[in-house]
Design a protein with these regions (language model features):
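Extended beta-strand solenoid/passenger and fiber regions
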Residues: 1-63, 85-87, 92-103
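A surface-exposed beta-strand-loop module
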Residues: 69, 73-88
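Glycine-centered tight-turn motifs at strand-turn-strand junctions
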Residues: 65-67
Length: 103
């Protein structure tokens, strides 16, 4: 099992609920750690990804209509939260990929 991890720390200001965040290029006001993470679609996001906000696991959804904590927006790695994010909030995105043994 391979795990790709992306960590974002909000360094300035708040982000309104349901605002799209590109986890690989979130723009100003964010500090980034880890590797880029992308999704092939909403199914891959909900089945292979765990998202944490300030250490608490968030319920992932395929779209805003799922009314979950965080939902898929685009394959580039864009997500949105159902709640406002604040300065110093830490977002962790863990994507799990099954690896096959060779030999």
């Amino acid at each position: 099992m391979q795990v790709d991890r992306r960590v974002l720390v909000r360094t300035a200001g708040h982000i309104d609920a349901n605002t799209t965040i590109d986890i690989n290029d979130p723009g100003p006001g964010w500090a980034l750690l880890g590797v880029p993470v992308t999704f092939s679609g909403s199914t891959e996001f909900t089945e292979t990804t765990q998202v944490y906000r300030n250490g608490e696991i968030q319920l992932t959804g395929a779209s805003a209509s799922a009314d979950n904590d965080v939902y898929f927006v685009a394959v580039s790695g864009s997500i949105a939260f159902e709640m406002k994010l604040h300065t110093n909030d830490v977002v962790q995105v863990w994507k799990f990929t099954q690896t096959t043994a060779s030999g």
